[in-house]
């Protein structure tokens, strides 16, 4: 082979090598570009994921703040509800104690009222009995007064008779003793009537005293019954107010 041919062959071989290297370089450049694009895409995805994550973290932080605020408000409402519940429980306990006390007191008042009513009835019976006795004594007194009046009439008649007898004494001296005996008996009857009047008057005063005492007892017992009835009404009103307050508190708790 000639020198020229050798040089041409060497140049052709070198050109092929250069083309091959250029092709390889282009391929490597394209591969590097593709790799760079992939890396860029991955970086963009990572950036987007990071932004999304940051946005999600921010949203979660805002949500946490809202949840914390809601939790704080819930805790405040819970404290308020707990306080109201404690107050309602205390009020319910007080109302229950008041109810039991009122029931006991009402029972005692009812028993006392029954006892006082019994005493009032007994006092009324005593007063009625005293009235009957007073009427009976008054009737007997009227009878005694009538007897006394008749006795006075008889005494007056006796005195008239004595006058007549005294007039006749001068004529009928033998009848003097008989007339004296008649006069003595008349005086004895008069003394007996006066004693009966004193006895009846004493019994009448006693009956009047008992009647006054019975009337005062009835008035006193009636006042006591009225007072107990007023106290019972006040206790019932207090229990009704406590019950309304408890119901209102429970409604407020349920409304919260």
Swiss-Prot record:
Q: What is this protein called?
A: Tropomyosin isoforms c/e
**Pfam families from the xrefs?**
Tropomyosin
Q: Which organism is it from?
A: Caenorhabditis elegans
Q: Which PROSITE patterns match?
A: TROPOMYOSIN
Q: Which residues cross the membrane?
A: none
Which gene specifies this protein's sequence? lev-11
Annotated stretches, region: Disordered: 21-52, 75-116
Chain intervals with Basic and acidic residues compositional bias: 24-52, 91-114
Comment text on domains: The molecule is in a coiled coil structure that is formed by 2 polypeptide chains. The sequence exhibits a prominent seven-residues periodicity.
What molecular function does GO assign, one term? actin filament binding
Per the database entry, which stretches of residues form a coiled coil? 1-256
Which keywords accompany this UniProt record?
Actin-binding, Coiled coil, Cytoplasm, Muscle protein
Q: Where in the cell is it found?
A: Cytoplasm
An example GO BP is: regulation of actin filament polymerization
GO cellular component terms? Answer: actin filament; cytoplasm; striated muscle thin filament
Instruction: Describe the function of this protein.
Output: Tropomyosin, in association with the troponin complex, plays a central role in the calcium dependent regulation of muscle contraction. Involved in muscle actin filament organization and muscle arm extension and morphology. Also has a role in male mating behavior by regulating the copulatory spicules. Binds to F-actin.
InterPro entries xref list? Tropomyosin (IPR000533)
């Amino acid at each position: 082979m000639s020198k020229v041919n050798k040089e041409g062959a060497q140049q052709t071989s070198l050109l092929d090598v250069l083309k091959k290297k250029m092709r390889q370089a282009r391929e490597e450049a394209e591969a590097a570009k593709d790799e760079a694009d992939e890396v860029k895409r991955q970086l963009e995805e990572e950036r987007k994921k990071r932004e999304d994550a940051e946005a999600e973290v921010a949203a979660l932080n805002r949500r946490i703040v809202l949840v914390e605020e809601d939790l704080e408000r819930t805790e405040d409402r819970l404290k308020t509800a707990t306080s109201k519940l404690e107050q309602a429980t205390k009020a319910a306990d007080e109302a229950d104690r008041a109810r039991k006390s009122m029931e006991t007191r009402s029972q005692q008042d009812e028993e006392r009222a029954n006892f006082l009513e019994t005493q009032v009835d007994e006092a009324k019976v005593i007063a009625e009995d005293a009235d009957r006795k007073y009427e009976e004594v008054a009737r007997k007194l009227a009878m005694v007064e009538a007897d006394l009046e008749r006795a006075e009439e008889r005494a007056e008649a006796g005195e008239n008779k004595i006058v007549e007898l005294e007039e006749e004494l001068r004529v009928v001296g033998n009848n003097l003793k008989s007339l004296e005996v008649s006069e003595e008996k008349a005086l004895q009857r008069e003394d007996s009537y006066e004693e009966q009047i004193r006895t009846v008057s004493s019994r009448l005063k006693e009956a009047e005293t008992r009647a006054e005492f019975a009337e005062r007892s009835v008035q006193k017992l009636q006042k006591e019954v009225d007072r107990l009835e007023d106290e019972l009404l006040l206790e019932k009103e207090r229990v009704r107010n406590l019950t309304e307050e408890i119901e209102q508190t429970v409604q407020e708790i349920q409304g919260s």
